[in-house]
C-alpha cells in the first residue's frame, strides 16, 4: 500500500508536470507572439524607412535636375553675353567698313540698280550728304531722310507701291551674324 505522503508526492509531481507543460506552452506562445509583433514592427518601419529613402532620393534628383537647368541657363547666359560682345565689337568696327571704297561703290551700285524717281531713301545720319551726292550723280529725283536706327547702307521706300527694300547694314549684319553664330560659338567656346 501506498502511503498518503507518497500519493501526495505523486499527485504533486503529476500536477507539476502538467503545470510545467502548460507554462512551456504559454512561454512558447508568448515568444511566438513577441516574434510576430517584432516582425510586424520591423516590416512596418522597414517600409517607412524605404519610403523615406525613396522620397529623399526623389528630392535629391529633383534638386539635381533643378541645379542642372540653373547651370545650363547660366552657361547659356554667359555664352550669349560673349556672343553679344562680339556683335557689339562688329558694330563698333562698322566705321572702318563705311569709310572703305568698296562700301561706297556697293552703296552706289544699290542706288543705281534700285532707285526710282519719287522714292524715299533712308540712311544713317552721317551718310545723308554722301547719299544725296550719289543720287544727284545718278540724276534721280528722290528724297533722302536720315533714320537714327540705321547704322549704314540704305532703305529705299517706293511710296507709289507701298514697298520698302532694306539694304541697311543692320539687316546685313544681323543676317551674316546669325549665319556665322555657330562658327563664332565654336571659336569662342569650342563647340559646334
UniProtKB/Swiss-Prot annotation:
The subcellular location is:
Cell membrane
Keyword Kinase attributed: no
A biological-process GO annotation: proton motive force-driven plasma membrane ATP synthesis
SUPFAM superfamilies linked: V-type ATPase subunit E-like (SSF160527)
The GO terms this record gives for MF are: ATP binding; proton-transporting ATP synthase activity, rotational mechanism; proton-transporting ATPase activity, rotational mechanism
Identify the InterPro entries for this entry: ATPase_E_C, ATPase_V1_Esu
| Pfam family, any one | vATP-synt_E
Transport: present as a keyword of the record?
yes
Keyword annotations for this protein, in alphabetical order, are:
ATP synthesis, Cell membrane, Hydrogen ion transport, Ion transport, Membrane, Transport
Example of a GO cellular component annotation carried by this entry? plasma membrane
| Topology term for the membrane | Peripheral membrane protein
The UniProt family comment states: Belongs to the V-ATPase E subunit family.
Complex and partners:
Has multiple subunits with at least A(3), B(3), C, D, E, F, H, I and proteolipid K(x).
Name the job this protein performs: Component of the A-type ATP synthase that produces ATP from ADP in the presence of a proton gradient across the membrane.
HAMAP family, per this entry?
Answer: ATP_synth_E_arch
**Designated name of the protein:** A-type ATP synthase subunit E
- Protein source organism: Metallosphaera sedula (strain ATCC 51363 / DSM 5348 / JCM 9185 / NBRC 15509 / TH2)
